[in-house]
Design a protein with these regions (language model features):
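Membrane-embedded alpha-helical segments and adjacent helix-loop junctions characteristic
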Residues: 28, 33-35, 39-129, 189-202, ...
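Alpha-helical transmembrane segments of multi-pass membrane proteins
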Residues: 92-104, 131-147, 178, 515-528, ...
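Core alpha-helical transmembrane segments of integral membrane proteins
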Residues: 20-21, 27, 387, 424-501
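Juxtamembrane and boundary regions of transmembrane helices in multi-pass small-molecule transporters
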Residues: 128-139, 147-221, 226-229, 301-302, ...
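Transmembrane alpha-helix interface/packing and boundary motifs in multi-pass membrane proteins
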Residues: 15-24, 101-110, 143-153, 440-446, ...
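Re-entrant/interfacial helical elements at transmembrane boundaries that shape
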Residues: 33-34, 80, 112-125, 137-141, ...
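Structured cytosolic domains appended to multi-pass membrane proteins
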Residues: 230-422
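Interfacial loop-to-helix junctions that mark the boundaries of transmembrane helices
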Residues: 1-4, 46-56, 171-182, 422-424, ...
């Protein structure tokens, strides 16, 4: 082994270790790897930067734009509303329909975008059917990953595998080359989940909403879910109260006393007719840090009795306990929803204060659930992370503002989730026509795939299906930069002999056992790697190895590359294996073992199906 080869393996090892550690962003790690290859002289600048001009990278960026166009025009949301009408209350039927609709969408949209659309719909359906969302959300994520196996554009690993063939002067996979195998995998996953898998899923998330058919949990249920005190009290401000004129921000009760102000109401008009104000006439509305208190205000407070008494004594308040679920206690125009930031949300790595949450949306964050723990103190200074679940209080009008932030957040427990209109719903027929035209052109290969995707992406903007700002925000830049920066690693392995060394080792170990053993080995290696690092990075690193292995064994590279593509999409077994798993972690109140228990079995089933079907459809 030469010095350059050893150096490349060291850089690759450090890169993979940083991927697994999750200490740094994946795209940053890939760029660091690229710079290391440049600084050590292993790659020349043109070789190192070739990934950014690769048609694969440009095509994936274009597909994100097309997917965002479908998202913004509500194509996916319409399917979700149909699901709401057709699903009924049967758990088996719900699981089956959720998986079918989700897989269909993720065959043409990104899996993350699909889950972001379907998540609030599925949670609302679960509550309507009195079923725990935990029973439906893992099937949702698995269907999104299985659906990505059904078309060439379903997931980046499919494109990576096809691009490997094209780069070697061979025809790439056709648009529907993945469809028979993808449908078979979906059927296997569907049968497994409705017969066995659903019994292994927990019923941890609350199953019953606050009212019949509301699809929204009650205050008491949310208090239990977020480990908040369920005791609710009403305190009235006397005319001489020292609190009059002070704002909630000045008081700082959540931080100082662990007491939340849920709402501000007034005494009946007949009693305080002489002190009517705009707020009194409205009876109640959402409140925020700048809300100033007035004499006669009635505050709806939540907290432990001892904390409430502490506040009452300190500020001379008259306090009485109330039933939070009694009619009229919590004003009708106020409610609670859970909000999740998306993987590409602009909220990430910012505090609630920096986001001006109350000023922008007219809501207040009551609690944040992170890594299974509830945070109620210091919320204004809390930095938002992907995977957080925010418990938000506000009016339905405010929730509508939140729901419009489709690229930044997913709103759960919202009664309007099933009826919500997309911001550009009137452009849906145009977006659908563009999508169909792109598929036809790619199927018949009239122009290169990258051209078809590029034209479709531009047409989405020109026809008003989305704006250029939406297009830029819709692109998963982390994935694009990751692919562009990691592709040269394959070049470095090839020119230093590292690729041949890896292939020789794989062939020496599994070659004597035949091509089926090689398929199994590649599947296991790819599937295990995809649980801990990006499935796209896994495919980029293993596709060249699969191709060279096929040449050394004197077999067709098509079945081996298809196996790598399929295995890269089996990120079922851990909550961090894929962004879609992380997205449902909070709403489903899942634990690591929930994914492991169901995911490993499904991986084994997909492995068995791959070994059976791939050699039949793509002979050696």
């Amino acid at each position: 082994m030469g010095t350059d080869t050893l150096l490349v393996f060291v850089i690759l090892g450090v890169t993979v270790a940083l991927f697994v550690s999750d200490r740094l962003r994946l795209d940053l790690v890939a760029l660091m790897s690229l710079l290391a290859l440049l600084l050590t002289g292993i790659l020349t600048p043109p070789q190192a930067l070739a990934g950014f001009a690769d048609p694969l990278v440009l095509m994936i960026a274009g597909l994100f734009v097309v997917s965002t166009g479908l998202f913004q025009t509500g194509i996916a949301a319409r399917l979700g509303r149909w699901l709401g009408r057709a699903a009924g209350t049967s758990e088996v039927r719900l699981i089956a329909l959720v998986m079918i609709v989700t897989a269909l969408l993720s065959g043409f949209m990104s899996s993350t975008g699909t889950v972001a659309v379907m998540l609030p719909v599925v949670v609302s359906l679960a509550w309507r059917a009195r079923i725990s969302p935990s029973k439906l959300l893992i099937p949702l994520t698995m269907a999104s990953l299985l659906g990505g196996m059904m078309t060439l554009i379903g997931t980046p690993p499919n494109l990576v595998a096809s691009n490997q063939l094209v780069a070697q002067g061979m025809p790439g996979f056709g648009f529907f080359a993945f469809t028979p195998l993808g449908l078979a995998m979906l059927l296997i996953g569907l049968v497994f989940m409705v017969t066995v898998g659903r019994h292994w899923l927990p019923s941890r998330a609350p199953a019953s909403p606050g009212g019949e058919g509301e699809g929204q949990p009650s205050l008491a249920e949310l208090a239990e879910q977020y480990e908040l005190p369920a005791s609710v009290f009403r305190a009235t401000l006397p005319d001489e109260s020292p609190l009059v004129g002070r704002t909630l921000q000045e008081l700082g009760w959540p931080e100082r006393h662990q007491v939340q102000v849920l709402a501000i109401d007034t005494e009946p008009d007949a009693v305080r007719n002489h002190r009517r104000s705009r707020r009194h006439l409205e009876r109640s509305k959402a409140i925020g840090p700048t809300t100033a208190l007035e004499a006669g205000d009635r505050l709806l407070l939540q907290g432990q009795r001892s904390s409430i008494d502490e506040v009452a004594d300190a500020y001379e308040l008259r306090v009485e306990p109330v039933d939070p679920n009694a009619e009229g206690v919590v004003p009708r125009n106020l409610g609670f929803v859970e909000v999740l930031p998306t993987p590409r949300s602009r909220w990430l790595n910012q505090t609630l204060a920096e986001l001006h949450f109350r000023d922008r949306f007219g809501v207040q964050v009551v609690a944040v659930r992170r890594d299974g723990a509830t945070i109620t103190e210091g919320l204004a200074r809390l930095t938002i992370r992907f995977g957080d679940t925010l418990l938000v209080e506000g009016t339905r009008k405010a929730f509508e503002l939140l729901r419009r932030e489709r690229l930044d957040a997913v709103v759960l427990a919202d009664p309007g989730a099933l009826e919500a209109e997309a911001p550009r719903a009137e452009r849906a027929p145009i977006a659908l026509a563009i999508m169909i035209a792109m598929l036809v052109v790619m199927t018949f290969a009239w122009v290169p795939n990258v051209v078809a995707v590029g034209v479709a992406a531009v047409l989405m903007v020109l026809t008003g299906c989305l704006t250029m700002d939406d297009a830029y925000r819709g692109i998963n830049w982390e994935a694009v930069v990751l692919i562009a920066a990691i592709l040269p690693m394959a070049t470095a392995l090839e020119i230093t002999g590292g690729l041949q060394l890896a292939v020789d080792g794989l062939v020496a170990g599994l070659g004597p056992l035949g091509p089926f053993a090689m398929l199994a080995g590649l599947f296991v290696l790819t599937s295990v790697a995809s649980q801990v690092i990006s499935n796209t990075a896994t495919a980029v690193l293993l596709a060249p190895i699969a191709f060279q292995t096929a040449l050394l064994l004197d077999v067709s590279p098509y079945p081996l590359l298809m196996t790598v593509a399929l295995a890269a999409s089996t990120a079922f077994a851990t909550p961090v294996a894929s962004p879609v798993n992380t997205l449902v972690l909070g709403p489903g109140q899942y634990r690591f073992g929930d994914f492991l228990r169901v995911g490993v079995v499904l991986q084994l089933l997909v492995l068995a199906a791959t070994l059976l079907l791939v050699p039949i459809l793509l002979p050696f």
